[in-house]
Structure formats: structure tokens, C-alpha cells
């Protein structure tokens, strides 16, 4: 892979005022100031909802900041995964993020600002403050799924009291290019507006491969009072790309002699996404040791992927299969939590209490590819570069359509209500204990439109969590942890018709 040649233009403008007179500080006695309280604003992992330092968390966590993203030239989640231990990236059929957490593959365990983001697509990084990768199950904080871990993207928010602008421009030797803008404006009455936008074009060494992505994300921060801050965000995404499913395998390994052949074409292999995400968050400080948080998210996704791919190969001929698969999903998610630090009997407790409600409407259908010569989704072709899918291996003209063979069509309605509580107890400077649990009421109805049937299921699931941390010194921690997660048998994308009892992971 050729290296990315990146040109970065950065402009920063800062407006500030200073009222202190010019004095020689060397002639003054400097008074030592000790600040107490406000511990809720210490460095923390956003997804964990509490201000506990990373070393005091009984879970493996990795953080990649926006500075790391820019320095390394990361453009997608998969780029970050390749640099992170304990997780791997997989192909994702050429149209979605697909992560393997400790051997468990997932295309749905993604979060944005701690809110579920489980539609299958390639997520952009232009508006990301940091990416948090947590390994191991933890349904207490994240609910269903996450059997191997989760990835949380923390988005950039408008900054009150600052004015700055940054530009990124990049181009590589294949012709791929990207441009991004990040600008922050100080408004009146304790408010700020920040605009992030990007546009990129995709290209690499493979035939047919191209695509475009556009993202626009204005955010506003309103300092309503010294204790209350409101964050507002609107995000729009418009993606289109060629789907490359790779090359056939022989004896369990890719046939490298085919590495310069694309088994697809630009008309049959395409993915599109149009999404709007609106978020509102209110943070209210009750005291130096207590804070409440409420968030509301409304999102709408319209996703399509269609493709043909090599489903069989004997060394000389290739069998092609394919399908057309659109999804429409609307989410409404509300969550609230209270974080309180208190001392009981000389022992410090960090208490988290919260609740979450999720309403999801999902519509999905799939048409199998249909070749006119076989009236089936499989057809055999000679291997050429480029591949010719208009004539089969017998020399007979054939045509492909995606409107003849309906495989499935479902409409799903999902409601999830959750409550959770967690207590981290500082027994001493060396020993810490974490205990808690979450109760989820998961209700799903799947209508099988193709066969005119319907199935429903309700699961009430309790997920415990416990951990012990030992710190032999300040910068070292050893932990023993037990946690559970569950995955309803509705499939990651909520479209399965046969709904069985949910599975659990420990």
C-alpha cells in the first residue's frame, strides 16, 4: 500500500483578554493554591459515564485521540483497529465496519457519545474528539450486545470562550482526496457554535474502486447557568462507494494469482447511505461531587448495499452469487443518569444510577441476484480481467436483475427499557471494588411481510458486574472482573424472523 501524502493547513485564531497589570512576578511571593472538589471533571472515558480514572476501571480500555487520528492519517474505524491490541478488523463485505473483539466478530457494537449506533456502514472520523475501545462484555453500561467489547466515538462539541479554525486537505498517489473543516465561533450570552464538515473521494489500486463521502455536523453549546450546560448537535451523512468482496480462495487461502482481478462491477456492486442524527444533551452540576445528565437522540438511516461476489471457484471457473439489501431504520433514544461521589464511614463511593429507553423501527428486505440463463442466484463464468458478466462460461448471453427473487421482507418494532446502578468503592489507596447490575426489558415484534406472519418476544434480563482492583503503585493496576452481556436472538440487525431465547456472554 502506498503511503498517504497529506498536506495539512492549520489556522488558529484566539481571542482573549487579560486584566492583570504588567508586573515582575519574580519580585512577588507566589502563593500556593490547592484546588479541591470538581473531581467530576478529571480525565475519563466518556463511555463509562463516571469520572473514574482509566487505571481504576476493571476493564481493558484503549483511547485514540483526534491528535493521533490526524498524525497517523486515519480515515476509518478499521485504520484505528489495526493499531489496537486485542481487536482485529475484517472485510465487512466491503460496506461496513466489522470488528473482532477477542475472537467475537461484530458489526453492531458501536456507540456515539455513549448512544447506540448499530447500523452497518463505514463511520467517518472528521468530527471525532476521541475513539474509545473497550474489550470484554459490559451490559451494565451498554445494554444488549457487546459480547466481545464495544467502540465509542466521542464527537467534537462547540467550545465556549474560544474562536478557532482548522483545515485538513489530503491526497494520495491513487487519486483519493479528502478535505475537512473544523471551525468554532464564540457567540453572545455564553454560547458557542462549532461546524465540522468533510468531503472525500475514494480510490485505490483495484479496478472499479471509487466512492464519495460527505459529512456535515454543526454543534452548539449553551451555558444556561454556571451549573447547567446544553449541547445540541445535527449530523448529516451521505455516502456512496463501490463494494469489493475480494478474491476467491483455494484450499482455504486466497488465490494470489487472482489478486489483480475484481469479481464485480460498478453497476452491480454499490453501497449508499443517507443519515440524519439529531442530539440534545443537558448536564447539570448539583454540587462539586454530584452531576446529572440527560440525553435525547433521534436518528434516521437509509442504507442500501447490493453486490455480486465469488461464491465458488475450481481453479479455472468462478461461480457468482449476489443480492440486493436495503434497510431503513429510525431510532429514538433517551437516557438519564446521576453520578454522585460520597463518603460513608470513611470509604469513598462513586455511585452511578441511570435509565435508558430505546424505540427502533426497522424495515429490511433482500432480493437474491437472478441470472436470466439459470433463473437462479448462481451462474458460472470464465475468469478474465476485467470480468465479463454478460456471457457465461458456456458462451451464452446472460443478464442480471435484483427484482425477481424476493428472499425476505421484514418490519421490526423494538422497545427497550433499562435501569442500572453501579458503585465503585475506594476501600483504600491500593484496593478498589466495583459492583452493579442492569435490568433490561427487551420487546421485539418482527412482521414477515413476504409470508404474512408475525412473531413477538419479550426478554427481561439482569446483567451483573463486579470487579476488584489492586494498585501496588499509583501508575499500575491489577484487576479481576466478572461481567455479563446478552444478545437477543433477533440478529445484530434486528431482522430475523425466528426469535429464540437470547444468548448470554460472560
Segments and roles (model prediction):
Residues 223-225, 329, 348-350, 356-360, ...:
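Structural signature of Gram-negative outer-membrane beta-barrels, strongest in the C-terminal barrel
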Residues 169-175, 199-203, 214, 236-240, ...:
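Transmembrane beta-strands of outer-membrane beta-barrel pores
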